[in-house]
Structures are given as structure tokens and as C-alpha cells.
């Protein structure tokens, strides 16, 4: 008799994690490996970040924090969002978790009911479908071919949406393609979403600073501020500051969604690492 829950039959180990483990094994065996498996920056965590983490340990900031992160970090996140996007958030609209992946998983857990659909443009980060399935949702994969620069078009989005659609996950800059949406493209997607007022949008912006073009990438809410009450913005420090192992991410969005995420944080990790929060 299997001791695993039946839901475990619907998911597989992350292909990128499996490939990363193999690359690590080969490297430890002396092979020279160019590792393109996971989103790991090729530079080290900045020294000032390391020093802030060490200082937190030395002054004893090693205890539980609030489930949604420290007030100081939430304030810093509000400041960054204001500075970068021009969007103003309140403290109640911010939550900090143990990595952007954890925040996304918790957001889906808090909002999906059995059979709810989540639209995922492809190519996609390999963890999205499994996170949806583990939370009893149904991934709806929408192919976005090279002819469309690997981006979701308004026409393809309209075709994918149904009365069961709960979320659209929009990852830009995209993992794995690096695709970035223009303001006009985002506005076109917003027009489609206007006809489906019950659909929520999760914008995964973890790569927003890993951008080689001119200027910077545009966030959906900058192009479509009217979606403010439907969009959950997810970001973190892993990619921009090479802090993948520090496990710290955050979200910004409507109070009711953030409140639900906080409710789930309490019985799961309790709180993000206080050392990582101080470093961030």
C-alpha cells in the first residue's frame, strides 16, 4: 500500500531540478559543465547584502517575525514598487514569503477550487503546471510560437478563457525565453480581460531587472491600472541580487488576496527567514 497521497501521482519532479542535480554530480566528478538548468545568477550575493545578514545574526535577529514579514521590509518593498513602477501600495497589500515560488504556490492554494482553470502561456517555467495541479486546479497551456516572439497574444488569450478560468499567469521577462511585453501588447491583453471580470492575474516579475534591452520592462499594471483589484504582483530578490539560496520573495495585491496568503503562511513556514529579510 502506497503511503503517498493520490495527488502525488499527478506531478513529477521538476525537470530543471533533476537536470541541475545531474549537472552538480558531473561537476563534482571533475567534468566542466555549462549549467543552464536553473535560474541561478553567475555572480555572488553582493557584499553589502552579506554584511547585513551577518549583522542580523550578531544582533540576535534570529527569532520569528510576523507571518507577512517585518514592517521594515514591507515598507522597503512599497518604496521599490513606487520608485520603479509608480504604483502606490499600502502595508496591508504586501506579503513576504520564503521565495517567489512559495508565494505563488500559496496564492494558488488560497484561491483555487477543484476544476478551476489557470491559463499558462508556453514556453513556461516548469513549476507552474505542477503547482496548479497540486492545488486541484487545471492548467490550460497556451502555445505562444516564435512567430509571436513567444508572447501571449490577445487573440490566443480570448480563445483560452472560459467560465472556469480563475487565473492567468503572466511571466515577464519570461523564463525560459526572456520575452518582454510592450505597453501596447499588455493593453491589448487587458482589453480581453475586461470582458472576463472574474479572471485574476498573477504577474511573475522575478526577472524584471535581468533585462538587456533599453529602458526596462513594463509591468501589466503600468499599462492597465484599471486591473489593480485583480492583479497579484510577485517578485523577489533571488535573480536581481543573486540571493537564490536566501529564499525570499514577496507579493503585492488586493487586501483580501494578501490576507488569505498570510493566513496560509501561519501554519506552513510561520514566517520568512529574519536573517534573509534583514539582508534584503
Which role fits each region the language model picked out?
Residues 2-99, 106:
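N-terminal small-domain helix-loop-helix segment of the aminotransferase-like
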Residues 88-94, 114-117, 164, 228-231:
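Short acidic capping loops at alpha-helix termini that bridge into adjacent secondary structure
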Residues 130, 134-140:
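A short helix-loop-beta submotif of the ANL/AMP-binding
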Residues 140, 144-214:
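Active-site phosphate-binding strand-loop segment of PLP-dependent enzymes
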Amino acid at each position: 500500500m502506497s503511503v503517498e497521497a493520490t495527488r502525488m501521482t499527478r506531478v513529477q519532479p521538476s525537470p530543471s531540478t533533476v537536470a541541475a542535480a545531474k549537472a552538480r554530480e558531473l561537476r563534482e566528478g571533475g567534468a566542466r559543465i555549462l549549467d543552464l538548468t536553473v535560474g541561478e545568477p553567475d555572480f555572488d550575493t553582493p557584499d553589502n547584502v552579506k554584511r547585513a545578514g551577518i549583522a542580523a545574526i550578531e544582533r540576535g535577529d534570529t527569532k520569528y517575525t510576523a507571518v507577512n514579514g517585518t514592517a521594515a521590509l514591507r515598507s522597503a518593498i512599497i518604496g521599490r514598487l513606487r520608485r520603479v513602477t509608480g504604483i502606490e501600495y499600502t502595508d496591508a497589500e504586501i506579503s513576504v514569503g520564503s521565495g517567489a515560488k512559495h508565494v505563488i504556490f500559496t496564492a494558488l492554494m488560497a484561491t483555487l477550487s477543484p476544476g478551476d482553470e489557470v491559463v499558462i502561456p508556453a514556453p513556461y517555467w516548469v513549476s507552474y503546471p505542477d503547482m496548479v495541479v497540486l492545488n486541484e486546479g487545471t492548467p490550460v497551456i497556451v502555445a505562444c510560437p516564435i512567430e509571436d516572439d513567444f508572447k501571449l497574444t490577445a487573440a490566443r488569450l480570448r480563445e483560452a478563457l472560459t467560465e472556469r478560468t480563475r487565473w492567468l499567469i503572466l511571466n515577464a521577462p519570461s523564463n525560459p525565453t526572456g520575452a518582454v511585453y510592450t505597453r501596447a501588447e499588455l493593453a491589448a491583453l487587458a482589453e480581453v480581460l475586461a470582458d472576463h471580470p472574474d479572471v485574476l492575474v498573477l504577474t511573475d516579475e522575478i526577472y524584471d531587472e535581468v533585462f538587456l534591452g533599453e529602458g526596462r520592462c513594463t509591468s501589466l499594471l503600468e499599462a492597465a491600472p484599471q486591473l489593480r483589484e485583480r492583479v497579484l504582483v510577485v517578485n523577489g530578490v533571488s535573480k536581481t541580487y543573486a540571493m537564490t539560496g536566501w529564499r525570499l520573495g514577496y507579493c503585492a495585491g488586493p487586501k483580501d488576496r494578501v490576507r488569505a496568503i498570510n493566513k496560509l503562511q501561519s501554519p506552513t513556514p510561520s514566517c520568512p527567514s529574519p536573517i534573509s529579510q534583514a539582508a534584503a
